Amino acid sequence: MDLVKQAEWNKELPKTWDELFDLAQKINSLNGKSGVYFGETDTWLILALSLERGGKLINEKGKVDFNNKAWQETFKLLSDFHTLAKMPAIKRSEAISSFYAGNLGILIQTSAALTQTEKSINFPLKLSKFPGVQSGGELPVGGSVVMLTNDKNKEAALKYIHFVTGEANAYVPQYTGYMTSNLLANAKLKDFYNKNPNYTIAPSQIELMGNWPSFPGDNALKATNTLWNYAEKLLMGTSTNYEEIAKQAQEEINALLP
């Protein structure tokens, strides 16, 4: 929050992307400081930009369609990080180090990094909800699938699964920042949440949580990497033509899908 105060942002943290870019620009004006970094090298944050607008990853034909309002706005927003917010063209690891050092004002990344971040900084940290979620929009969240056979050798694994998904799940937010997936465990975290308000941000958005969609077929990972590679062109400023980038990404990804 030190850079936010230095930038004379004397109001609530941004609730929209326009407000976030405005704050980023103010921080950019401080000597040697950067405003914002879109901090993941996976596609879930990119998906969040579309899903919060009601977008879908795969259409009814099993293909991607980036030529619609939600996805066009998403690709433009990715470009805006470079053109408007002047996001530094650096690696994620460098951005995290910059944030730890107090030289980066806003870092957009997974809540799983919260505990480590708190241990690594010497300034007040405040989390904010994901900006710009529109009516009917969702945010993608992760999940796990457990599959066991009747093999007796799996007994120990099953006991462990019962443990980590039960009341012990209360340790998950305390040691990572992730939201617990167990409502009973969550109820027991009241005192922890009162003392650590940053950890309430993730569960406070539970009504917005939706599926984390993936690409179909054997080339799902290649398609995922392709989407990120095109998004990175906009984030890093290699290209500012978001419409052409969206078109190229759609063509290349659909060629990979069944």
Predicted regions and their residues:
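Beta->alpha turn/N-cap motifs
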Residues: 42, 92, 109-114, 203
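Glycine-centered hinge/linker elements that transmit conformational signals in sensory
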Residues: 21-26, 61-89
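Alpha-to-beta junction loops
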Residues: 30-34, 101-109, 123
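Short helix-initiation/N-cap motifs at beta->coil->alpha
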Residues: 15-22, 88-101
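Long, aromatic- and glycine/proline-rich binding clefts that accommodate carbohydrate-like moieties
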Residues: 175-229, 233
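Extracytoplasmic/periplasmic substrate-recognition and gating elements
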Residues: 7, 80-84, 118-181, 212, ...
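Hydrophobic residues within well-ordered alpha-helices
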Residues: 20, 27, 50, 98-106
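Periplasmic solute-binding protein
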Residues: 1-12, 21, 38-60, 139-147, ...
